[in-house]
UniProtKB/Swiss-Prot annotation:
Gene Ontology CC terms, in alphabetical order: cytosol; cytosolic small ribosomal subunit; peptidoglycan-based cell wall; plasma membrane; ribosome
Protein family: Belongs to the universal ribosomal protein uS7 family.
Keywords from the UniProt entry: Ribonucleoprotein, Ribosomal protein, RNA-binding, rRNA-binding, tRNA-binding
InterPro entries, per the entry: Ribosomal_uS7, Ribosomal_uS7_bac/org-type, Ribosomal_uS7_CS, Ribosomal_uS7_dom, Ribosomal_uS7_dom_sf
Superkingdom assignment: Bacteria
Quaternary structure annotation from Swiss-Prot or TrEMBL: Part of the 30S ribosomal subunit. Contacts proteins S9 and S11.
Biological processes per GO annotation: ribosomal small subunit assembly; translation
Source species: Mycobacterium tuberculosis (strain ATCC 25618 / H37Rv)
Record-linked CDD domains: uS7_Bacteria
Native organism taxonomy: Bacteria, Bacillati, Actinomycetota, Actinomycetes, Mycobacteriales
Protein name per its UniProtKB record: Small ribosomal subunit protein uS7
Functional note: One of the primary rRNA binding proteins, it binds directly to 16S rRNA where it nucleates assembly of the head domain of the 30S subunit. Is located at the subunit interface close to the decoding center, probably blocks exit of the E-site tRNA.
GO molecular function: mRNA binding; rRNA binding; structural constituent of ribosome; tRNA binding
């Protein structure tokens, strides 16, 4: 562990097109091998497609999708007396946003559409309607936490 304590959080710049920190975080999650301009093109293209299909502000659609994907609980491993228990814990708000974005991008990469722009746009639209693999992942996470509720007293 570092002696100086945790590294300070760096401030996130607002996205130049939509003026939203969420879009900046999404761009950073889509980013692969340092190709930021490509990641921006993918995200902006996906948000434009979402706007064309819904007719509403794409940032609002993205926020609705994230609200449907954000987990409230998760399980963490805790070793007690030689046994490892899956202990349900509440998820901090910043971590829930990060997990939601990670799941959105991860499951959009696994989709079958032709381009990444289409995949990301459709995953965002599905998530905003309460459908899609990323929403299912959240439900599975909540089910795991509910199933291991008996170990909640091991929380730290």
């Amino acid at each position: 562990m570092p002696r100086k304590g945790p590294a300070p959080k760096r401030p996130l710049v607002n996205d130049p097109v939509y003026g939203s920190q969420l879009v900046t975080q999404l761009v950073n999650k889509v980013l692969l091998k340092g190709k930021k301009s490509l990641a921006e093109r993918i995200v902006y293209g996906a948000l434009e497609q979402a706007r064309d299909k819904t007719g509403t502000d794409p940032v609002i659609t993205l926020k609705r999708a994230l609200d449907n994907v954000k987990p409230a609980l998760e399980v963490r491993s805790r070793r007690v007396g030689g046994a490892t228990y899956q202990v349900p814990v509440e998820v901090r708000p910043d971590r829930s946003t990060t997990l939601a974005l990670r799941w959105l991008v991860g499951y959009s990469r696994q989709r079958r559409e032709k381009t990444m722009i289409e995949r990301l746009a459709n995953e965002i639209l599905d998530a905003s309607n309460g459908l899609g693999a990323s929403v299912k992942r959240r439900e599975d996470t909540h089910k795991m936490a509910e199933a291991n509720r008996a170990f909640a007293h091991y929380r730290w």
